[in-house]
Every structure is written in structure tokens, then in C-alpha cells.
Amino acid sequence: MDAPEEPQPPVVYTMENKPIVTCAGDQNLFTSIYPTLSQQLPREPMEWRRSYGRAPKMIHLESNFVQFKEELLPKEGNKALLTFPFLHIYWTECCDTEVYKATVKDDLTKWQNVLKAHSSVDWLIVVVENDAKKKNKTNILPRTSIVDKIRNDFCNKQSDRCVVLSDPLKDSSRTQESWNAFLTKLRTLLLMSFTKNLGKFEDDMRTLREKRTEPGWSFCEYFMVQEELAFVFEMLQQFEDALVQYDELDALFSQYVVNFGAGDGANWLTFFCQPVKSWNGLVLRKPIDMEKRELIQKQEATLLDLRSYLFSRQCTLLLFLQRPWEVAQRALELLHSCVQELKLLEVSVPPGALDCWVFLSCLEVLQRIEGCCDRAQIDSNIAHMVGLWSYAMEKLKSLGYLCGLVSEKGPNSEDLNRTVDLLAGLGAERPETANTAQSPYKKLQEALSSVEAFEKHYLDLSHATIEMYTSIGRIRSAKLVGKDLAEFYMRKRSPQKAEMYLQGALKNYLAEGWALPVTHTRKQLAECQKHLGQMENYLQTSSLLASDHHLTEEERKYFCQEILSFASQQEDNPGHKVVLPMQFARLKDLHFDPPNAVVHAGGVLTVEITVCSQMPIPVHVDQIAVNVHFSIEKNNYRKTAEWLTKHKTSNGIITFPAEASLFPASQNSLPALELSEMLERSPSDNSLNTTGIICRNVHMLLRRQESGSSLEPPSGLALEDGAHVLRCSSVTLQPGANKIAFKTQAKEPGTYTLRQLRASVGPVWFVLAHIHPIVQYDVYSQEPQLHVEPLADSLLAGIPQKVKFTVTTGHYTVKNGDSLQLSNVEAMLILCQAENRAVVYSNSREECSTALLRIQSSDKVTSIGLPTAPAYHVIEFELEVLSLPSAPASGGDTSVPGTPELHRKQKDSQRAGHCMVTTDHKVSIDCPWSIYSTVIALTFSVPFRTEHSLLSAGTRKYVQVCVQNLSELDFELSDSNLEDKGHATDLRLAPLNTQSQQLIHSKQSVFFVWELTWTQEPPPPLHCQFSVGFSPASEEQLTVSLKPYTYEFQVENFFTLYSVRAEILPASGAEYCKTGSLCSLEVSITRLADLLDVDKDEALVESEDYFSTKLMYEVVDNSSNWAVCGKSCGVIAMPLAAQATHRVHMEVMPLFAGYLPLPDVRLFKYLPHHSAHASQLDADSWIENDSLSVDKHLDDQLDCSSLRSRGSTHSTSSSEHKGLPMPRLQALPAGQVFNSSTGMQVLVIPSQDDHVLEVSVT
């Protein structure tokens, strides 16, 4: 302890540094225990809980145990943590009280006094118990007495600062327990010391950083302080925390540089603005670059020195963290930021010095990463390293240009001097790389030594970079490097090698739509093609560049003149043609005349195109031609003027899509920009520092567009040969839009498709291989046609109607004297008027001429003279035709409309008959251009529908005629008349209509009534003809007299034979009928005439005194107001004598209160079947069964439900008579039965005991 003080060696800052623990007391004892202690201490981890809420960590503690010396204790103001002893241990194995008092106690007292003098409170006393010594000394006190004395003398309130280690060199459980307790205590005290001292150090460091705005603050001094903290974390193997310290220093220095660029510079930054004199690159092969650290400590480091040292420390820690790819990423950012920081600080850098530093640094980082990773790891992480390869290649290229190693003649003396100066700035090679054959230093020195060496190194770097970019899918970057390589080959006069790279880059830029790179690459490619003598390719590229608006006007004119000069030089060799794509001009639109692009054979068609020239100067074109492909359409109908007119564009203008981009990656296919505002404010006063716009989907916008097809125009262009070509010679194309017109005379019918547009300038032909969209014009040859159609929707019979005649001449020329011969139809007249005119139209519907029609009519033929007209014209004229009106004769007699069923039948038939009756007239027309007749059919609709009915009032009879107007016109009816065509003298028709003229509107009806009287009984049948004059109500006076409308019908057996009367009487003693009470129904059937011829049928029965006939009556109540009780029908024998009456009595019950209409009483003729079986049966039995048959002439609406309902209860009887001949019911003719009770009503009052009152209102 009292040995003479030895000079302490300087602290070596290496990765082997460990926390210092001093050892005082028995050094021999510690030496014997040290191997076990150093091995056991880091074995178990301890949880380190740090201040400021930082997450706890598990650490393995190691220590550097050194002999205690007072010089090791830190002095006031010393901030070095690496030399700071974190714990002091005193070792003793004293077991004798006398020895303790004589020596140990005094030594402990001196030791503690020294610690107290330096304010060190982290100490520990270790008493080692040894059983061997205990056996040798029998009179010693127990061990505990020595420990107790030490604790009483030195520990006072800190008894845990004295620990016992029992037999540390033995292998026993007791020894192991003692070691575990000791090691736990030692680790705990060490962690407590770390936490306390590091916390104090961080507070002091934070206080120093907060003084950075004071004038005397030094970044280098602060750098050393925070790096001391990083060293401690590294010493504790907390590499992440150590890296954070360097990152904070990096960010702090970068912010000061940015502020300096903005005009807010710190005074200490001037130390880093000194000129750069050394550019030997990064040093990454040793943990700490002490030379640069000393320069920083002395404030003599340049910006490159500081950045190099700072990155070397970050690199070391990242490699310990096994994150080598982050080293590459950070290195690339560092190199770029250093270049910018040198510009911001305006540091003087010799030309090429920074390129050397970047090149050496890139290779140093790459070799450092390759040294700690295997080949598989490197291959899978090329994406992180390729940026450094590319940057190194770029800087080597800059050095080559700077030192004249790329020029054709090689470096000159000035270039050599510059090379010597650059190599001198590299200094001597570092010892750690002196024995490495491919060290960055040697590579740079070799590359700058000769032209051949530079080319070798540059090509190696370029090819390696291209291969790496391609392998990771960064095709754009690979093509960009390829462009640089092409530029290098062009300088080396090797254009054949450069072309491949330029073509690849151009294809990529075209695929993705990068306009400016396309222009720049094409310029390089044009130069390359010119050197190679590829004249066709050069002219093609020149035409693209001449029309490229990204170039200046002078550049565009130069390339345009190149094309014109070549064309003028080749005029001596007219047979040689150079075919190029038409890139300098764009087809804008095309206009046809006629507009529908349809012309007849022999007609003239004009095609006018608009060509936009993108040349900067007017270009004289020898010839512009359009190659036309001819095809014959098999479908002849497609060639008719009608079809072509309907299916062609009306304006005749076809617009071609603007080729806004030759690139498939058009703006329409890209997603919309997602822009957001970015504001950065100062944390101190919230003032706005920077503002900008961020694109959040830039990864989508800049994504590569794969393209499998070539985007350059196809090289195999050829001029199409054909017989059909539209030409226009000697045209000067001005910059912008130029209109060029082609005229052609159509000869052969078919479809002509415009295929290829070409322009010639001397032997140079510019070709637009395909015109898209498809452009066609049609030439047709049409047969003459005649088309007849009404002007209205439908032709009405009976009034003059206009018909339009359309003659399409087709290829036929109508000569003077040609006429249409119409065969006359008996029921249709052709009205001739003096003012009839024919109009001749051209094929484009332009009126050519008008002429009066020459119409000559005879009994059989009407001749219409046609005006002269050339081929493919249209003749139109109108004629009036008149179809004679008629109505179909009625089929026979109508029923007497006395019952509701008959009214319903009439209404239903009216609903079904709202369509007009039509009449077809076929007219045969002979045309001058054909030997065959043309037959046309004209359909006329009869505007009226007529119905008749017989009305009865007792024995008086009336005939009613209903005329319904089904057309859309209003008519005026006049002179209605009804006459007997049989001319019977004993019949007379007396009209009851007072008006001579009546207006009938559309969809309305007019009724006419006549009273029918006769003098002979019975009257004969009536055969009538109704006629009425009509004319359109809206027309003026017609020039032709119209025939009246006629309608014929016949009425037979219209006289009254039977009169039926029904009467309902209340119950006996009651004044009114009541609901629910039986009432008496009296039906009387009266014969009004004696035996007539109409009665002589199967129902006639002859007796001794008179004739009779069998009738069946039926009482029916369709309105369900009455309930018939008992039988509702029966068969009676009616005497055939005038005034013979048959009465029937039955009971009915009213179901509702109110005025109720009487039930209907119906009469039928009952016709028995004359057979043996039938004569043996009673008539009533026939009525009762369910097998009554009704004559097929019976009215459809006859309701026999009562019969069926009664018969359903006698199904057994019905089955018994199955197969027997059945009687028949026959309806009486219309008008023979008159029901005088029709329309009568009976008052029914409600019963007094009804709880619910139901009243029927009719």
C-alpha cells in the first residue's frame, strides 16, 4: 500500500475497458481469489433500473480489479468515467484479535479516511474465513468476534458493507452459499454505484448542453463529455444506449450546420471551416481512431475528421448490434450530407479531394461489411450496398474526367499535376490495410495511375453496379448507370458499345413515360448512330428530336436540317428509298365530302385531312399520298343508299386521338396525387420554420410500368403498293395544322379503307403505317327503286288521302317520256290535280329541279310522266287517292235489347271492336327501267263502325243505328237515311232525327232512330240499307264529291207475340212487403196473336178445340234481392189465341229493404224430343232432372244457374236417365216477347225485429 508511486500509463480507449474496482488490504489473498471472482461475477445477469422512467435492462457485470491507490480517486472537475473507480473493496483474512488491533484496524482506518477525503462512499469490506488457519491457532477468538469488531468500528449503520467469504477456495455447499451471497452483494453495490454516478454524470452533461447558447461554449468539449457516457454504456455492453449518444451528437452538429447555412452560425463552427488538406477516407478497421479523437479534443479537427470519427464509432456499435446493413445505409446518407455540409460551411476543398474521400469511404464501408458477413448474407442484402457501389462509381468517373483519364489524348501535364496533388492528400496508407492487396487506398492509387487502369476499375465498378441494380429489380437505376457507361464509351470513341446501353435506357424511359430522359437519351443515341453510320436510324431519331418540344429551337432546327440535307444529297440516287415512321407529323382529323362518306359509282369524293407538323421550320414535301385498300362487300344490302345513309356519320368528320404521349404509362392510368401540407414549427416560440408539400403515394406514382413490347416504332416499315392511291403533290407543311385535300372519282362499287399515309422528301419516305381508327368510304351501284308510302300514319277510306312516291334512279337515267303506268282499281280512285309537282334531289338530298306532273288517266291505266333525272338521284311527288267507303252487311237479326245481359253483350263487343276495319288495294305499276311490274299494297281503314238494334214499346217497334268514329279526325255527318231495300208496301220507316247535320268527334258515337210501322199482320221481314253523308270537319271545301257511307242489315220476326207482366203483392193483411216475409209473385203471360206461321214447329200441339205451344218460364234474380221459394221455372201449354193468358203464382222473400227491382221473367220455347221413351215421360220430370239441353242458338248470356242448382239435388235421377233423348230450350226471336214489368220497383220495409238494417238502393 505504501509502495512508491509508479507513473500511471494513459488510458487506452479500447473495447476491453471494464468498470474499475480497487482492491486494498491483503493483496496476496485477493490474488488467490481473483480467478474465481472474475469467472463468477459476470455469470448471472442483474436487473438494472435506471432513472427518468427508462426501461430496466438485464446486464452481465464485469470489472477491472486494480490495486487501490489514492491517485485513482477522481479529483474535482474530472468527468472521465472510464478511469472512475465505481467500488472500493478491502480484503482481509485476519482471525487474530491482536493482529487486528496491531495492523488491520489501522490500515482500514487509513483506507476509509482516504475515501472520505475524496467523498467516495462506495466501498465494501470482505473478511475471508479460512478453516486451515483456524485449526493452527487455538487461542484465537471466534470469527464472528473479528467481524463484529469491524462492523462496530467501521460500518456503524451500514453493517451490510461488511461481508464474510468462507473458504473461497474449497468445493463445498457452504463455500458455494458464501460465494453466492458475496457475488450478489458485489453486483448490487456495483449497480448502485453505476446508477448514482451515471445519473450525476448525465445531469452534468445535460447542464453543459443547455449552455450551448453561451458565447464560450465548445462543441468539442461537449463531444468529449457525451462520448464518455457512450464509452461507459459500451463498457457495460449496452451498445444501443451508446449508439444513441453518438446519434444525438450527430443530430446536434447537423442542426448547427443547417443553422449556419441559414445565417445563424455558432463561433465554434469556425474551427471546422478550415480548408481540407487530407482526404484519406473513413477509418473503420479499429474500434477507436485515436488520432482523429485527439484532433477533436484539441479543436483542430476538420469537418471530414469529425464526421469520419463519429461515423467510425457508430459503425463499430452497429456491428456489435449485428446491423451491418444499417451501416451501409448510414454511410450513404453521411457521404451525401458531408458534401452538402462542406458547401454550407463554405469550406475550401481542392478539386477532386472530396471525390477521393467519398470513393475511399464507400470502398472502406463495403469492405468492412464484407469482412463481417458471409457471401449468402451479402447476396441477400445487395439492396443496402448497391448505393455505395453506385456512388463510388460516380466519384471515380468524376476523378477520371478531372484527371484527363477519359479524354482521347490522355492526361496532359496539368492533369498529371492534379493527380499528384490528389494522391498526396491521401497520405501514407494506414498500417491496418498495408498488407491488403485490394484496399481502397491501393485501388484509388492504381486507378489514377494510368488510363488503362482507370478504365479497368471504372468498367468493373459499372458492370458490378448494373448487375446489382438488375438483380434487385431497380431497372431505372441500372439504365441510368448504363447511360453513364454509354457516355464513357462515346468519349472513348466506342459508339458500338454505347448503343446497347442507350437503347436499353430509351426503351425503359419510353415504357414509363419519362419525357425529359427520353429526349436526353435520344440526343445521345443520335450522336452514337451518326458515328456508326446508321443513317436510317439516325434520320428516324432526328425526326423525333426535331419535333420534340423539350429541346431548344436551335437544336430542333439542327436535326430538321440534318434530314433535309440528307434528302438533298441523295437526289442523285433516285432508286434508293429510305422509309421512316412518320413521327414529325400527326394526323389530327379527316373530313369527307359528301359527309356520309358514301358516293355512287362515277361520283366524286373529296377527302380532306388535317396534318399537324411538329417541325420547327416549313418542310417542302414532294408528295403526300394515302394508300387505299379496296374490298367488295358480299352483302348487297349494305351497298344500298338507304343503309349507307343510316349507318354513316352525318358530319363526315373523323377525329383521331391526340398522341399526347407515346408512352403507355399515360396520366390516366396513374393514381391521383395524395398531397398533404407539411408545417414545421420551432419548439420554443412555435414560429413557422419550414413549410412544404408531401406526396403520400409517391411509391405508387413512381412504380415501374412493365412493358413486354417494344415501344420504338417498328423498323420493318414498307411502302404498300396498290392500284388505289390518293395523291397530292408539292405540299409545304408549315409548323402547326395543315389542310390537304384529295379528290377521287369512284369507279368500282365496294368499300375503300384508308390504310397508309406517307410523305416523301426526296428519297426519304415518312410513313404512318396504320390509320386508326379505321377510316372507310363506300361506293355503291344501286338498282332503280320505287317506294310508295302514305304521308299519314294510316290511310282513311272515303276521303282523299296523300301518298308519297319516291323514285330512286340508281344507275338508271330517267329520260324524257319515261312514265309510271298504274293499273286502276275499281274501289280506289287516283285524283288528278293540276298543281301536282315532282321534285328531283341529288344523292346528298340537295334539291336539283322541280317539274309539273303529267298525269293521264283512262279506264284501266293511269300514266304518270316522270321528269328527267340523272343517275343516282331521287324523284319525289305526291298524289291523292280515294278509297270508296263501305261497311260489312249485318249477318242477320239482332236480339231485342230489353235485358241487362244484352246491354252487357253490346258493351263487350264495342270494347273488342275499337280497331278499324281495313281494306287492302293492290296496285300494279309498270316502271320504265324494268320489264316486270311492281305491285304495291295500300291499306285503307274504315273510320266508322256501325251497329243496329231493335227497340220495343209494347207492340210498337223502333230501329236504332249507332255510328262510332274510330279515327283521330272529326267528321260532319249529313243526310242520314234508312230505306227498305225490299220495297214492301205495308212497311213504313218514320225518322225520329230532327237534325240534318251532326258533328261526330274522334272516338265518339252518334245514334239514329226510326219508328217501324206496318199494315199487314204479321209484317214481312225488313231488309234495310243505312246511308249517311260525311266529310272531314276541319277540311275546306273538297274538290271532289264524296260518296255516302252505307250499312246494310236485316230484321225478321220483329212483331210482339207475348206480353209478360209480373207483380209482387205483400202478405195477406200487410200494407207493404217486409224483409224476411214471404210475398206473392204473380206472373201473367199473354198471347197477342192467333196461330201464325212462326208457331208451326215442334212445340205446336193440336187439340180438338185449339192449338197450343209449350213454353218454359224462368224467374231469375241476378241482383240477389229476392229469394224464390219453391220452383222458379216450369213448362206451360200456351193456347195460340189472341189475349190468351196464363198466370203463374209463386212465393218470393225480399232479402233487403228499399225499392227493389222485380225479378226477371224469361220465356223459352220448349221443344220435346219425339220418341217412344220421351212420350211416356211427364214434362215436369224433364224439368226436374239435370240433363236439359239448350239450343245452340240460345243467347250466350242466358243464366241457367237456377236450373243447375235444382238439378244438382237429383244427381241420382240424372244418372238413371242417362242416355235418354233430352228436351231442348229455344230462345224466342228478338222482339217477340215484351216484358211490361221491366224497370218496375217494389217498396220493401225492414222487419221490426231486425237488429241489423240492410237497405238496397237501386
Curated annotation (Swiss-Prot):
Phenotypic effect of disruption: Gene-null mice have smaller total brain area compared to wild-type animals, with specific reductions in the size of the corpus callosum, regions of the hippocampus, anterior commissure, and internal capsule. Only white matter structures are affected in mutant mice. There is a loss of myelination in these regions, but oligodendrocyte numbers are normal.
Compartments, as annotated in UniProt: Golgi apparatus, cis-Golgi network
Keywords: ER-Golgi transport, Golgi apparatus, Phosphoprotein, Transport
InterPro entries in UniProt: Ig_TRAPPC10, TRAPP_II_complex_TRAPPC10_C, TRAPPC10/Trs130, TRAPPC10/Trs130_N
Keyword Cell wall biogenesis/degradation: no
Record-level GO cellular component terms: cytoplasm; TRAPPII protein complex
Ranges for region Disordered: 888-913, 1201-1222
Residue positions where Phosphoserine is found in the record: S707
Pfam families associated with the record: Ig_TRAPPC10 (PF23604), TRAPPC10 (PF12584), TRAPPC10_1st (PF23036)
Ranges of biased composition (kind: Low complexity): 1201-1214
Disulfide bonds: none
Comp. bias intervals (Basic and acidic residues): 901-911
Keyword Phosphoprotein: yes
Family (UniProt): Belongs to the TRAPPC10 family.
Quaternary structure note: Specific component of the multisubunit TRAPP II complex, which includes at least TRAPPC1, TRAPPC2, TRAPPC3, TRAPPC4, TRAPPC5, TRAPPC6A/B, TRAPPC9, TRAPPC10 and TRAPPC14. TRAPPC9, TRAPPC10 and TRAPPC14 are specific subunits of the TRAPP II complex. Interacts with TRAPPC14.
Role this protein plays: Specific subunit of the TRAPP (transport protein particle) II complex, a highly conserved vesicle tethering complex that functions in late Golgi trafficking as a membrane tether.
Protein name (database record): Trafficking protein particle complex subunit 10
Gene designation: Trappc10
